[in-house]
Regions:
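Hydrophobic/aromatic beta-strand patches that form the interior of the parallel beta-sheet core
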Residues: 35, 58, 104-106, 133-137, ...
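A general structural motif
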Residues: 31-32, 100-103, 130-132, 203-204
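Short coil-to-helix leader/linker segments, especially the first N-terminal amphipathic alpha-helix
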Residues: 9-17, 107, 111-116
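Intrinsic-disorder-associated interaction segments
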Residues: 6, 80-87, 120, 139, ...
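The conserved 3'-phosphoadenosine-5'-phosphosulfate
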Residues: 55, 64-74, 164-171, 179, ...
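PAPS-dependent sulfotransferase catalytic domain
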Residues: 109-196, 204, 214, 221-234
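PAPS-dependent sulfotransferase catalytic core
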Residues: 1-99, 243-250
């Protein structure tokens, strides 16, 4: 079993199920197209992937997160000696099992791509070129993004599902603010890496979506429609499966209060 995340059980159970064979179903249409949600942390990628799963656009998930990848690779027979992941073999075995309507989707983050490509930009671009479509997910307010990332690390709670209670930050600003500063630097570095690589991919294959747009239903639907029109081979689009849960939107009051205190301190220091 995967370790329970935060104070709730629903998120942990969801990860457990997505790593298990429960979602492994060879698609009658085989595999004809691939896409990736390429994002820095805390940009709403989990939420977007939930929505795209509802829409039958593959089973997008964070397959290359080491904690999940090792578990999936072990049952697919893709672990080498010493527990090393054979990426190519794992992808080849996973894609036919997780395609839906002929489409495979995955979530991908900069550190995962760095690891998969052995820090080679040329290899990273070659990996990105395997995808027919690439969604760049970004966030305009990087300070709130860094605060969200710090909070997730402190609480070990990345999304909220069902009635899982939200856990607040319980450390002093003397501990929290250096974490936020470090995360701001990491986010800037990852953004630069992501956008520079994406600029080397065919621009017709790339679409950018901002976190701040995700609250608008038409933004999610626009991405789903774009993917289906490009990858659905002209077939009628399937009806969404609303039984599959979406993450709850977290109340940002705590994060905005932290932001105000952080900016006040920065202003005082300058």
């Amino acid at each position: 079993m995967l370790e329970q995340v935060g104070p709730g059980k629903i998120e942990s159970l969801r990860w457990e199920i997505l790593c298990s064979e429960q979602w492994d179903h060879p698609d009658d249409l085989g595999l004809r197209a691939r896409y990736a949600v390429f994002s820095v942390q805390r940009t709403g990628s989990g939420w977007l992937c939930d929505y795209l799963r509802q829409c039958g656009l593959g089973v997008p998930f964070e397959y290359f997160n080491h904690a999940f990848a090792s578990r999936i690779a072990e049952r697919l027979g893709c672990l080498e000696r010493g527990g090393l992941l054979h990426v190519g073999r794992c992808i080849a075995r996973l894609e036919p099992l997780r395609a839906r309507h002929g489409i495979f989707g995955t979530k991908l983050q900069p550190d995962q791509l760095r690891s998969m490509s052995a820090q080679s930009d040329a290899r990273a671009i070659a990996l990105l070129d395997r995808f027919d479509k690439l969604i760049l997910l970004r966030r305009q307010d990087r300070l709130l993004q860094a605060i969200s990332l710090a909070r997730a690390h402190l609480t070990q709670q990345w999304q909220l599902y069902g009635d899982d209670p939200a856990r607040g930050v319980d450390v002093d600003d003397e501990v929290l603010f250096p974490m936020i500063r470090d995360h701001l630097g990491k986010i800037a570095n990852d953004e630069r890496y992501m956008t520079e690589l994406a600029s080397k991919v065919d621009p017709r294959a790339v679409r950018t979506l901002w976190y701040e747009e995700l609250a608008e239903p038409h933004a999610l639907e626009s991405i789903a429609e774009w993917l289906w029109n490009a990858l659905g081979a002209g077939a009628p689009r399937p009806a969404p499966d609303r039984r599959l849960p979406l993450a709850r939107k977290r109340d940002e009051a705590e994060s905005r209060a932290i932001k105000a205190r952080y900016l006040a301190l920065v202003g005082t220091a300058s």
